[in-house]
Design a protein with these regions (language model features):
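C-terminal and inter-domain tail/linker signature
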Residues: 150-410
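Primary recognition of N-terminal secretory signal peptides and signal-anchoring hydrophobic helices
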Residues: 2-152
C-alpha cells in the first residue's frame, strides 16, 4: 500500500467528505479550552472538542505538541479503513474513525470515546491515547476548561533520582507534594523538606544513578537502579505513589550493597529490561502472589517446580546461580534455619512481564528485614529474578514514625 504524507492524507479526506458525517450529536465545540503541554500553553488554530465529557484534539496539532514529525514515516492514513497510524517513540498506534479503542503495538486498548473524522477532513483523537501510548500524564479539569498533558510519572521519578547526581532540587520541588509527602525510609524525616535536603547534600558527592527498570501500576511507580557514591555502589528499589494531580505523596525504598557476580556470572542489576505483555499484568501478578504465598511464605517446596519451565531460570541473587535446582538448594537451607524466612507480603506491583513483591522476613540475626523481589514472567512461568534485602533498624533509630511498610497495599 502506498504511504501518504499527513498533508496528502488530509487532502484525501476532503475528497471523501461527502461520505463522512459532520460532528455527531453530543459533540460540542470547545473554543474556551486551554491546552498545556509540558508546562507550555498551546495556541491551537483548530479548537479541541468535547464529546460525552471527554476531550478530543485535532491530530496534527496534538502531534506537533508532542514533537511527532508530520511526515509519512511517522503518520499515515488509510483511506479505505478511515484509519490513522502513528509511529513514534517505540509505539505504533492505529486509530480508526468511529472506534472507541486504539491498537497500540498490536494490542487493542479501550479509549474514553471514539476517534472522530469530520466532514471538513479533521481527525480528532481522544486525548487519553497520549497516556496509553506514550505514558504522558493527562489531567482534564472541566470546571476551568483546562487540559494538561505532561511528563509521565515514570519520567518524573527518573528525573528526581537523577537529581542526586547534581544536587539540583528543581524536579523534586515540582513533582513532590509540599504538604502530603509521607516518607517510609527510616533514615529520613517525613515531609518533602527532608527529601530536598538529601538531594542538596549530594551536590559534589560524586553520585551516579543508573536506572535499569521502571514499572508503573496505577498510581505507583517502582524503579530498579544502581547508585554509586564516591565509588561505593548499592542496588535499590524505590516506590513512589502519586495522587490524582500527578504529585508524589508517598515513598518506600530498599537498598543493598552491590555484590560481585553470582555463580552464573550475573550481577544484581543486569538482565532483561524490556516490558512486554501489557495485557497480562493482572494474570502475572496473580501468579507471582500465589508463588510467594505458596512457596516462600507457606514453605510448600513441593509446588516449586510447577511455577517454572523446567530448569530454565535466570538468577540475579548474588549467592546463587541459575536454574531451579539451585533455588531448591537455597530454599532447603532456609528451611534448616541457615538463611531467611518470609513472614508477610506487603505489596505486589506489576506491569506486563515484570512483577515486584515487597515482603517482610526474619534475617539471620533474628531481626526484621525487608525484601523486594522482582520477577520476570514468560509464558506463564517465572523466568528471571532479582532481589534486594535490607535489615530494618530498631525503632529507636527511626527518623519518622511511618514504618517501613505502613499503608502499603496488595
Amino acid at each position: 500500500m502506498k504511504k501518504h504524507t499527513v498533508t496528502a492524507a488530509l487532502a484525501g479526506l476532503l475528497v471523501l467528505s461527502s461520505a463522512v458525517p459532520a460532528l455527531a450529536a453530543g459533540v460540542k465545540p470547545a473554543t474556551g479550552i486551554q491546552v498545556w503541554v509540558d508546562g507550555k500553553k498551546e495556541a491551537y488554530k483548530i479548537a479541541p472538542i468535547v464529546r460525552n465529557k471527554q476531550v478530543l484534539i485535532p491530530l496534527r496539532q496534538l502531534a506537533t505538541s508532542l514533537g511527532i514529525p508530520l511526515d509519512a514515516k511517522h503518520i499515515t492514513f488509510n483511506t479505505a479503513r478511515q484509519s490513522t497510524t502513528i509511529r513514534y517513540d517505540q509505539a505504533t498506534v492505529v486509530l480508526v474513525s468511529g472506534s472507541p479503542e486504539a491498537q497500540i503495538n498490536g494490542i487493542k486498548v479501550p479509549l474514553s470515546t471514539s476517534t472522530i473524522l469530520t466532514k471538513q477532513g479533521v481527525t480528532y483523537v481522544p486525548v487519553d491515547v497520549v497516556k496509553e501510548a506514550w505514558g504522558k500524564q493527562v489531567i482534564w479539569d472541566p470546571a476551568s476548561q483546562t487540559l494538561q498533558i505532561g511528563v509521565s510519572n515514570k519520567d518524573k521519578v527518573v528525573e528526581i533520582l537523577k537529581s542526586f547526581e547534581t544536587g539540583n532540587t528543581k524536579a523534586a520541588e515540582a513533582w513532590i507534594s509540599k504538604d502530603q509527602y509521607i516518607q517510609h525510609n527510616p533514615s529520613f524525616a517525613s515531609g518533602r523538606d527532608a527529601f530536598l535536603q538529601g538531594i542538596s547534600q549530594s551536590k559534589g558527592a560524586n553520585v551516579l544513578v543508573e536506572v535499569q527498570r521502571v514499572i508503573q501500576d496505577g498510581n505507583d511507580v517502582a524503579v530498579h537502579y544502581k547508585k554509586s557514591i564516591a565509588g561505593k555502589t548499592s542496588i535499590g528499589f524505590d516506590i513512589f505513589r502519586f495522587d490524582s494531580n500527578g504529585k508524589i505523596v508517598e515513598h518506600w525504598d530498599n537498598m543493598q550493597d552491590s555484590a560481585p557476580i553470582n555463580p552464573s556470572g550475573h550481577t544484581m542489576i543486569d538482565g532483561t529490561t524490556q516490558i512486554t505483555d501489557p495485557n497480562q499484568t493482572e494474570t502475572n501478578k496473580t501468579l507471582i502472589r500465589k508463588f510467594v504465598d505458596d512457596v516462600l511464605v507457606g514453605k510448600n517446596r513441593a509446588a516449586l517446580e510447577s511455577y517454572y519451565n523446567g530448569d530454565q531460570y535466570i538468577q540475579h541473587n548474588p549467592l546463587f546461580g541459575d536454574g531451579v535446582s539451585s533455588l531448591k538448594q537455597a530454599l532447603s537451607a532456609a528451611g534448616q534455619g541457615a538463611s531467611i524466612g518470609y513472614d508477610q507480603v506487603h505489596m505486589v506491583l506489576g506491569e506486563g512481564n515484570f512483577v515486584l513483591v515487597v515482603s517482610e522476613l526474619k534475617s539471620p540475626k533474628g531481626t526484621s528485614a525487608a525484601v523486594y523481589d522482582l520477577f520476570r514472567v514468560e509464558n506463564g512461568k517465572i523466568a528471571e529474578h532479582w532481589d534486594v534485602v535490607q535489615e530494618i533498624p530498631a525503632k529507636t533509630e527511626w527518623k519518622n514514625t511511618n514504618g517501613k511498610f505502613l499503608k502499603m497495599h496488595i
